[in-house]
């Protein structure tokens, strides 16, 4: 089924107008438009209390602040609020403050929207420091849990290796940022997580290892039922695929298996429980953004999918948005989706680090 492609807003320039949005497939009644363009390498997003949209980047080294200066509901002001950073992919907003994750640290910009309004040079403090400096899988997705703690992943610095912690973990920081506990271990590279709105449990995606073939291993959707659980890396992948280098003598029963095997090399990024009211009930489930494969003979991913849950069991996993990948032609792609950010009206923003835009996905009715 195909939804609608809506006209772009005032913040959209010629580059976005050239994107083939008509190639995107959405369920009937849904629409997609470019919300903000010219945000190269757009990654994680966070929304301020006054409506400022903060966007981190990876290779660009910048953080953007996007605002609606005239109150018409359309972004029209873009500011590069930080530059020259080391892969500032992750951003999170809490109680007026913006948190920006680089590879080895997390900055805190107190009262950020007031700072931006003042026009003065932005001040910040280091909230977290001293994390590993390895760049491979070192970029971060960060977020605050319902417990008020900041969760920060530290990816494995390799395709496959057995390095000491905090590598291959998700860390939960104390409220002052000075200490942490290992909340999940055996996590190769998570770039997205969210908390179940009912149970409060952390669900996260994990990117599987490479160089084992086109079909092995599958990437994972996982659920943390007890702090400190081990999810298998580097000994097992997708629950039961024994690693040829590190799996000998290990028992898969000693590790937590995934809730869902997502597919080989699909590269899951954001995991988002939809809690808005504007989508029909059939679409108020768990959305997973698949960034797309890079080392598979036929590409896979490059889409947003929806996992339908019954309790903690996934009973269906189906496409929600696809069309960025031209599988039927030359296996080329024109976009790679990354992160989802809900808006107050129930629509979802979706960043794209390849096209350098942020889309808005909304339900407009049948």
Residue ranges, per PLM feature:
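Asp-box/WD-like beta-propeller blade repeats and closely related beta-sheet repeat scaffolds
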Residues: 92, 104-145, 153-156, 184
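Conserved beta-propeller blade signature
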Residues: 52-56, 97-100, 149-153, 201-205, ...
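A short loop-to-beta-strand structural motif that recurs across blades of beta-propeller domains
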Residues: 22, 62-65, 97, 105-107, ...
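Beta-propeller domain segments
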Residues: 17-26, 139, 156-160, 173-178, ...
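Acidic, glycine-anchored loop motifs typical of Ca2+
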Residues: 71-77, 116
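Beta-rich catalytic cores
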Residues: 41, 49, 77, 84-87, ...
């Amino acid at each position: 089924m195909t939804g609608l492609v809506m006209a772009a807003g005032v913040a959209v320039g010629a580059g976005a107008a050239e994107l083939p949005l008509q190639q995107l497939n959405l369920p009937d009644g849904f629409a997609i438009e470019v919300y903000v363009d010219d945000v190269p390498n757009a990654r994680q997003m966070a929304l301020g209390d006054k409506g400022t949209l903060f966007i981190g980047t990876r290779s660009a080294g910048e953080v953007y602040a996007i605002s609606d200066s005239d109150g018409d509901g359309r972004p029209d002001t873009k500011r590069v609020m930080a530059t020259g950073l080391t892969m500032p992919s992750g951003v999170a907003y809490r109680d007026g403050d913006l948190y920006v994750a680089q590879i080895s640290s997390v900055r805190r910009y107190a009262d950020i929207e007031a700072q931006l309004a003042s026009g003065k040079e932005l001040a910040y403090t280091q909230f977290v420091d001293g994390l590993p400096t390895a760049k491979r899988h070192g970029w971060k997705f960060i977020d605050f849990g319902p417990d008020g703690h900041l969760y920060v992943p530290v990816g494995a610095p390799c395709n496959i290796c057995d390095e000491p912690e905090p590598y291959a973990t998700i860390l939960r920081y104390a409220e002052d940022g000075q200490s942490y506990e290992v909340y999940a271990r055996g996590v190769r590279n998570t770039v997205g997580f969210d908390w179940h709105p009912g149970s409060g449990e952390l669900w996260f995606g994990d990117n599987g290892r490479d160089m084992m073939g086109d079909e092995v291993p599958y990437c994972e959707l996982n659920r943390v039922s007890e702090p400190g659980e081990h999810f298998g890396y580097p000994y097992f992948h997708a629950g039961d695929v024994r690693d040829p280098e590190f799996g000998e003598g290990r028992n898969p029963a000693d590790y937590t298996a995934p809730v869902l095997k997502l597919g080989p090399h699909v590269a899951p990024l954001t995991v988002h429980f939809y809690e808005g009211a504007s989508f029909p009930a059939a679409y108020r489930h768990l959305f997973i953004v698949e960034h797309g494969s890079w080392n598979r003979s036929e590409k896979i991913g490059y889409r947003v999918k929806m996992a339908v849950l019954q309790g903690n069991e996934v009973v269906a996993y189906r496409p929600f948005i696809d069309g960025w990948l031209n599988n039927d032609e030359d296996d080329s792609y024109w976009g790679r989706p990354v992160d989802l950010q809900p808006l107050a009206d129930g629509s979802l923003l979706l960043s794209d680090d390849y096209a350098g835009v942020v889309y808005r996905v909304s339900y407009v009715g049948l």
